[in-house]
Amino acid sequence: MKPCVFTGSAVAIVSPFCGDGVDLEAFDRLIERQIQGGTDAIVVCGTTGEAATLSYNERMALIERCVRTVDRRVPVIAGSGTNSTASSIALSKAAQSAGVDALLTVTPYYNKASQSGLVQHFSAIADAVDVPVILYNVPARTGIGCTVQTYQALAKHPNIVGVKEASDNFDLIQDTLNLCPPGFTVWSGNDGSTAAIMALGGKGVISVAANVVPREMHELTQLCLKNRFLEAGALQLKLHELIRALFCEVNPIPVKAAMELLGLCSGELRLPLCRISERHLEQLSHALEPFRPAV
C-alpha cells in the first residue's frame, strides 16, 4: 500500500509579498496560524501561492522557510510542476533536498500534451525523486486534463501516490476511485466539493479557504473522515457563501484580499494579477462577517 501523505485539510498557502520580494516574516506568521488552527498539511508554492510569478530563488526560499518553520509538525508539500519536464525535475530535486514530505505536480500548461506525453512527463519527475508525488489536475487553468486511463497508468509508479482533483468532473473522480488501486489517493482540489468527494472516498482537500478559516476546513474534513456526513454537509453549507466569494475572481485575487481585510498579510499581488474590484471586495467583506470571530 502506498503512503497517504495526509488526510484532512491541507492549506494551499498564499505567498505574502512586500515590495519586490516575498515577506518571509509574514509567511512564518501564516504558517503558525495554520498549525494552531489544526491544518493537517501545508502546500507551498502552488497556484494559490502564485508560483507562476515567483522566481526560482523565491520559490526555494519559501519552500526552505516552510520546512524550517513547520519543523515536522505537519507534512510540507511543495508545488514543483511547470510546463517543462526538465525544469520540473530540477525544482522537484531541489525541493526534496530542502526536506519536503511530498511534491505536487500540475499538468503541464500551454503545451497541451497528449495523454501519453502526460504519462511520460509525470513518470520522469517521479523517477527523479524519492519522495511521494501527487498529481494535480486542473484543466480549467492548464488547458489539458488527465483521463482515468492516465491515472491508472501513473498509479503503477511507486512514487506517484494520488491526485489533487480540481476538475469537478465527478464522472472522472468516481472512475478514478473505482478503477485505480486502493493506495492511489484522491484529494479534492475545490473547497466547495470537499464533502462530496470525501463521501465518495476522497481523503481530504487541498484548500484555498483554509487560508481564511483553517479550523473550519479541518473540522469539515474530520467530520467526513468519521463518516458524520450530515454534520459535514451542514458545515459545507455554512461555508458556501464564503467559498463562493473566495472565487468571485480568479484565485488567488480574492483570498489575498481576504487576508488583507483580516489583517493577516498584505493583499499585494504580482502582475498580471491585480487587485480585486470594489464590487467583489464588498461581496467578500460581507461573506467574511460570520467568520470574523473565528479568524
Predicted regions and their residues:
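Active-site beta->alpha loop and helix N-cap motifs at the rims of alpha/beta catalytic domains
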Residues: 2-11, 15-143, 151
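C-terminal alpha-helical cap/extension of soluble enzyme domains
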Residues: 8-16, 37-39, 199-202, 206-295
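Gly/Ser/Thr-rich beta-alpha loop segments that engage phosphate groups in nucleotides
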Residues: 10, 48-51, 81-83, 145, ...
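General structural feature for long, well-ordered alpha-helical segments within catalytic domains
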Residues: 23-30, 58, 62, 87, ...
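A generic alpha-helix structural signal
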Residues: 28-31, 63, 92, 122, ...
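Short helix-capping segments at alpha-helix termini
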Residues: 68-74, 98-99, 129-131, 156-159, ...
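Catalytic alpha/beta core domains of metabolic enzymes, predominantly
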Residues: 127-128, 139-247
